[in-house]
Amino acid sequence: MATPFISDLDSLLLQLSPKDFLTLRQAVQGVHVMGGIGSGKTSGAGRALAGAYLRAGMGGLVLCAKPEEVELWIDYCKQHGREDSMILFDATQGCNFIAYEFARKGGAEAASSVTDTLMKILEAADTAAGQKAGKAGDEFWTKTARQMLMYTVSALYAATGNVTAGDIVRFVTTMPTRNPTTDEEKAALDKNFAVGILHQMRTNPARNIPDDLKEQTISYWRLQYMAYPEKTRGSILAHVTSSLNRFNTGMLRKCFCADTTIVPEMTMAGAIIIMALPVLTHNEDGLIANQLMKFIWQRAVESRNGLAPQFRERPVFLYADEAQYFVNSYDDQFLSTCRGSKACVVYMTQSLPTYYSMLGSEKKDAVDGFLGKFNTHIFHLNPDTRSNAYASALIGRGIQKRRSGNATRGSSKQHGRNYGGSDSATYTVGDSENQGSGKNYAGLIFKTEEGESSNEGVGTNRAMANQQGRSYGYNSGGGTNESVTDGYSENMDNLVESNWFSTALKTGGPDNNFEVTALLFRAGGKFKRPMPGVSDNCLLATFKQQR
């Protein structure tokens, strides 16, 4: 019996506060979760979202970076009654992606689709090998590699009706690089694999392809390919064969080039495909396996609206913890269009630099654009400054009221005393005596006159004075003063400062009563219980951990 499901976009999936919910409409617009190591993002928001999507009856694809994620999702399916929907894609299962694309598309259109898938394999292999995209000249190598693969797949499909990774490698490595000049070289062409494929395509094809594609294929291999400088041709060959050779042996050959037991459309009927080929167990092959399955699932979901109604109604999800391992250039396009296919994407990572480190710092704008496609962001505790600055800038700026105040108190006291005194005494004693005699003559013309005088005197004077004074004084004074000012100022500032994300959120565990908190941002949201002091589209959510 098929698992029941909800399809109404306004259906409630997850309670975020007493009055706020995550709806299916918001889920199909994408949810991105970011939080540092030990922040509780997996056991908090990650667990809550997984449970909500399983209870809603969705089908989905779960990408796994760590081996414990496989067991975690097995537990999720059991807890929410979806154990019968669970399919483990391990080394015993398979999806022959080339045969799948030809069955899904058919003809020349399938050749192009297979080529696109092969290019994603090359991109995933480069990422796994630590070779970042976005460097100078990458566009040239990408175009030339795609051209080689396109005309290889077309030739093999037309000539034999079947395409394998091994035949692709054999074809491109046996193709002559120059026209024969000796009889021995001409004779060798009769046994050459690549030449035989081109001849069969023209004379006795197993599948018909458009005549223009057939002529383009022959022209490429006989003219353009030979015209490449030897070094350029060798670099293109090395790029293609080094990645596809992985599919000639081991797990990748068994899971993706042999029998098919799993196809993406199974999720549209409610299956939960868990990629039990974790990256940290299978290393580069694990990363390629997860990315390859993700890509063909995305392509199938995008085209699901052309299928029968029973494959169009059920919502599906793509869930990736440690999403930095699985992101590629196609995600931006998928996130732009998947809403119409009822696809809910949940990507979780630690920080922005984890994306940059996997994709290359040259891809910073591409990463920012990719994140902008998610309508809901959940931010857990994070010590990374760039991630926190991104969160703060995403929430934005607004008028902030800041209180200012001043209070002063003072007191003073003064005491003083002064004393003064003076004594003075004055005594004056004096005696004086004068005595004198004299004569004076006055002579006149023709007459003389003579006279004499004398005087004598004795005197004594005495005086005495005595003064005395005293003065006393005392003064005392004091005072107190007090003033208080209070006011507010308005400033344009960040609604949530970046350091808040590294200090204010709970990380679960017994110290936090097993509660994990996170700031939930929704573009255009109007929460009924928004985060105080911020904006209506921000909510402080609390998630309970399972004890």
Per-range role (PLM):
Residues A2-A343, W500-F514, L520-M531, T542-R547:
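P-loop NTPase motor domains
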Residues G487-E490, T517-F521:
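Long, cytosolic, alpha-helical-rich C-terminal regions that act as interaction/scaffolding modules
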